[in-house]
Design a protein with these regions (language model features):
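Cyclophilin-like peptidyl-prolyl cis-trans isomerases
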Residues: 1-168
Length: 168
């Protein structure tokens, strides 16, 4: 069964088919954060026309994250074509919560950023996103439990960090 992320944004809905077979750790992280409501109310803090829209920063500046980092799965056979969901990072193995969706093919990012999904509906919405637009929610459809269970030890570790940060 496919795993779909439904983004509800100010501009409308975006549906992305996730690729747990190609990026299991990245998908487990994204699904876990989405199910916890981490992305709800965050903005697209960086929008570059004819390149990409970026979101997932709790500070809204591009400097925030979930409080942990994890390794790349960038050499998974998925390339940066138009409409892919990929992890933003600050260098090798610095993935957290920030992601981007491409407007155009960006092959120079291949091997440097982990592609983990593809827009299947709402590319017109992606193309219309403006900086500061809100991600109202991200909901997961499909066997989210299996995606998280595949990396249960890491998800448990991440959730300890997220829970500690929520109490701080």
């Amino acid at each position: 069964m496919s795993l779909i992320a439904h983004f509800d944004t100010d501009r409308g809905p975006i549906r992305v088919e996730l690729a747990p077979d190609k990026a299991p750790l990245t998908v487990a992280n994204f699904v876990n954060l989405a199910r916890r409501g981490f992305y709800d109310g965050l903005s697209f803090h960086r929008v570059i026309n004819d390149f990409m829209v970026q979101g997932g920063c709790p500070k809204g500046t591009g400097t925030g994250g979930p409080g942990y980092k994890f390794e790349d799965e960038a050499r998974n056979g998925l390339g940066h074509e138009r409409g892919v969901l990929s992890m933003a990072n600050a260098g090798p193995n610095t993935n957290g919560s920030q992601f981007f969706i491409t407007h155009v093919a960006t092959p120079w990012l291949d091997g440097k950023h982990t592609v983990f999904g593809k827009v299947i509906e709402g590319m017109d919405v992606v193309d219309g996103v403006k900086q500061g637009d809100t991600i109202r929610s991200v909901k997961i459809e499909g066997d989210a439990d299996a995606a998280v269970a595949a990396k249960a030890d890491r998800v448990a570790e991440w959730n300890k960090t997220l829970d500690a940060n929520a109490r701080a």
